[in-house]
Amino acid sequence: MEEVFTAALESKIFRKRWVLLPDYVPDVLPHREAELRRLAEVLAPALRGEKPSNALLYGLTGTGKTAVARLVLRRLEARASSLGVLVKPIYVNARHRETPYRVASAIAEAVGVRVPFTGLSVGEVYERLVKRLSRLRGIYIIVLDEIDFLPKRPGGQDLLYRITRINQELGDRVWVSLVGITNSLGFVENLEPRVKSSLGEVELVFPPYTAPQLRDILETRAEEAFNPGVLDPDVVPLCAALAAREHGDARRALDLLRVAGEIAERRREERVRREHVYSARAEIERDRVSEVVRTLPLHAKLVLLSIMMLEDGGRPASTGEIYERYKELTSTLGLEHVTLRRVSGIISELDMLGIVKSRVVSRGRYGKTREVSLDADRLAVENALSEDPFVARLL
């Protein structure tokens, strides 16, 4: 252990490692000037004490949505303060909070409401929030990151509707606006009409970064993050190229660069080279798979386990075979099974997440079927599944 600490102290790789972390927001965001300006235009009325429009920011993972929102609000809050106007951003991640109750609690606590961990309904938390806001002044801008997770929970759409209509219950001294951030371009289409009509007053779409744009971003951050001369010339272009293949994900590019540096540091090497980037890619993929599998709902985990068990036979499994094995597993656990249609939907979701791969094949006069196989590191999947006490009983 002591040698690990010594190696970290003696390392000459990093200067400011934290500028490569996902939650770091720099003062300059290359290739997002148009999005910064548009969101600033939407929120600028707050400087006059007026309610800004609600906004929805769309885009795939790593396209700069959250960073743009945070940078605009950071500057807006500072400018408002210099004018004697209170603008308070409230950041809540709907996926991390998991339930409408916890989302509502996080918003309420941000304005000084004490909320018990359990014991109240969402409606009661909302009423406490309204009561508290009614006594305040200023503009409160709620940023709901990964907002698409909220309507998937019971009561989530109702909470969204209430938030978008909350100003009708407040006086003219305080205003609330909502900025939603989502990776799902079809998010709004699945909402109830009453929610849809009031949620996305302004919509901003963030395109994926290109490889040259990712290279610009990495070069800017690398100047701050690393000591001079420690990066081989082809490290940044390689990180940019690998991330560009995955829909232009800047977060992925930054992770590759950071982990490559950490691997070089752990190996007590003085330079970061191509092989460190490839090692970083493998390490990140294992971590990504573990995180995705760990957070799957129970029935999705059982479907995934069914696919793995059937794959032991050496060939891809059909949807029908997966469903029969899944029903056996639910029976073993004493659970109600979901429908074949729902299992087919779960398989599509796992495919989209990159955990399995599926393809439709023709079986002649027997028609078409879908063949499914694992598309992620098997050991990483097994380890993540084993952390669930229910699933662990089946391994």
UniProtKB/Swiss-Prot annotation:
Top-level taxon: Archaea
SUPFAM superfamilies, A to Z: P-loop containing nucleoside triphosphate hydrolases (SSF52540), Winged helix' DNA-binding domain (SSF46785)
UniProt-listed InterPro entries: AAA+_ATPase (IPR003593), AAA_22 (IPR049945), Cdc6_C (IPR015163), Cdc6_lid (IPR055237), ORC1/CDC6 (IPR050311), Orc1/Cdc6_arc (IPR014277), P-loop_NTPase (IPR027417), WH-like_DNA-bd_sf (IPR036388)
MF terms in GO: ATP binding; ATP hydrolysis activity; DNA binding
Pfam family, one: Cdc6_C
Record-listed ATP binding positions: T63, G64, K65, T66, A67, Y209, R221
Record bears the keyword DNA-binding: yes
This protein's UniProt keywords: ATP-binding, DNA replication, DNA-binding, Nucleotide-binding
GO biological process, one term: DNA replication
Note on domains (UniProt): Contains an N-terminal AAA+ ATPase domain and a C-terminal winged-helix (WH) domain. Domains are separated by a rigid linker.
The family this protein is said to belong to: Belongs to the CDC6/cdc18 family.
Function of the molecule: Involved in regulation of DNA replication. Binds DNA.
Protein name: ORC1-type DNA replication protein 1
